Amino acid sequence: MRISLGLLATASAAAARSIPHPPQSGRANCVQSLVPVHASATNFNLTGLDPTKPVPLKADVPVSGRFTVEVHFCAPTARRAAHADTLLVMAPGATYNTLYWDLPLQPETYSFVRLANSQGFATLSIARVGDGLSSRPDPINVLQLPIQVAAQVEILKLAREGKIPGFRGRFRNVVGIGHSLSSAILNGVIVEAPQVIDAAIFTGYGHADPSNMLFPTTGFGFIPANEAGIPRFRNLPDGYLTTQNITSRTVFYGPPGTFDPDVLAFDEAHKDTVSIGEFNTLFTSSVAAPRFRGPVLTVDGAFDTSFCPTQACDTLAREAQFYPNARSVEFVVIQGSGHDLNLHLTAPGFFQTLLSWIVRHGF
C-alpha cells in the first residue's frame, strides 16, 4: 500500500472552523471543530467486483482530495505535570462517531474522555472521514483504507504541531488509540508514517489474513444507510451502510448481562455509517509495521468472536510478530466484554487498563 502524504497549506488552526458544541462536548474544557486536510493515496480497484466472491485486490487507483474532519479536543480537568505534554488521540470503529469515546449517557461509566481528562490527559477524539460531521466522499472509490490512513496522518501531524482549535501549544507525546476499523487505520498509520505517534493502542482488533480479500457486506446485518429510515442518512449516496436494527447491533456486544440495555438503545439511536469501500479494503492494512519503535498494546473483549475465537483469546499472542522493532508489545483480554469494549459494564476497568498502560510507559 503506497501512500503519499501532503498537508494542505490552509489546514491549520486558523483554517479550521469551530462549530457549535453538541450535548456530549458542551463542556468548558472542550472545543469541537471541523479541520480541513489534503490527503493522497493509492486506492484499490473495486470496479465490477462481487463481494460474495472474494478475489485479491489490486492497488492502482490514485486518489487525492480535500477532506473535512470533525474533531473534539478536551483539555485536562485536573493538573498532572507528568502528563502535560501528552495527547491521547482516539478514533471510532465502523458505524460509530465521536460519541463512542465520550458517551453522554452515564458518562461517569462510559466516557473515556472524561476519565482521561480527570487524570490529567488532553484528548482529541476524531470522526473518520465518512462519519459524524466529517466529509462524506464517494463511498466506494474514494473512501477506502488507504485514503483514511492518509487523512489520519494529516490530523496527527496537526495535533502534534498544536494546530487544532483549543490547543495551547505543541505536544511532545502523542498516543494513538483506535477501535475496530480505526485500529486497522492506525496500523496503516504506523506502517506509513511511524513518526507521527509515540505509542499505539489497538482495541477490538487483531491482524487478519493479509490476503487483500473482499469483505462480504451481505448477511452481517448491514443495509444501505439511505434506506434505514433515518432522516440524517436520507440523502447519503449509495454505498454508505449502517446496521439494520437494534437486533443486528447486538453483534457488537457480549451476551445479555454484560451490557446495559439502555446503552444498546442509545447506541442504536445514535449509530453512524461505514462505506462499502472501507469494508472491502478493511484487511489491506493487516501488515507488519517494522519502522514503529514505540510501545504497542492490543485489547480485545473475551466475547469478541471476530478476534477472540476462544475465551482465552490466545490468538493475540501472535500480534508481536507484526511489530518487530516496537519498544514493547502487550495484549490484554477484558473478560465479560464483547467487541464494543467502551459500551459494556466492564468499561471503567477497560478505560483504567488503557490509562495505566499509558502511565507505565512514561506518557
What are these model-derived regions, one by one?
Residues 78-124:
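Short, surface-exposed "cap/lid" segments of acyl-processing enzymes
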Residues 19-83:
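N-terminal cap/lid segment of alpha/beta-hydrolase-fold proteins
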Residues 301, 305-316, 342:
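Conserved alpha/beta-hydrolase "acid-adjacent" motif
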Residues 292, 298-300:
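Short beta-strand/loop motif that positions the catalytic acidic residue
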Residues 1-18:
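Fungal secretory targeting signals
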Residues 141-167:
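Alpha/beta-hydrolase active-site loop
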